[in-house]
């Protein structure tokens, strides 16, 4: 079985990306947010998602057999969405500082450590050219 985990930062598009991949016939979509696939898988692929990026996704052997898809989105739209959802009262976990740290962490593991099976997609590019960016990853 091939496992796929989608992560990024809240309101970057993890849910919609998981749904798009989950609609592929050979993919079993894990409905609830999780950072590890534990349930029985009946299809060739399984996809899960979590809105937050954690360093152990890259450094722990528990995720070494996962295809890791990191999704980013223009921070203007991320924080417009977060402000709307939280009535302009964003907590520390959803702060611009955490957004920046998330971007730095991904850059470190993808480009400095060169962790295999790690991919980057921009939310703004998902739908272009009949999902071409996503097809390039999968």
Residue ranges and their predicted role:
Residues 1-50:
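PAPS-dependent sulfotransferase catalytic core
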Residues 51-138:
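PAPS-dependent sulfotransferase catalytic domain
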């Amino acid at each position: 079985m091939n496992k796929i985990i989608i992560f990024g930062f809240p309101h970057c598009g993890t849910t919609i990306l998981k749904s798009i991949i989950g609609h592929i016939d050979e993919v079993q979509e894990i409905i609830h947010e999780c950072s590890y696939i534990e349930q029985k898988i009946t299809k060739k692929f399984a996809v899960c998602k979590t809105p937050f990026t954690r360093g152990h996704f890259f450094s722990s052997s528990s995720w070494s057999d996962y295809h890791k898809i990191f999704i980013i989105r223009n921070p203007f739209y991320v924080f417009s969405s977060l402000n709307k959802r939280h009535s302009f009262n964003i907590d520390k976990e959803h702060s611009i500082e955490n957004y920046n740290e998330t971007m730095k962490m991904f850059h470190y593991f993808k480009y400095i450590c060169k962790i295999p099976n790690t991919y980057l997609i921009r939310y703004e590019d998902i739908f272009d050219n009949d999902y071409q960016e996503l097809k390039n990853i999968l």
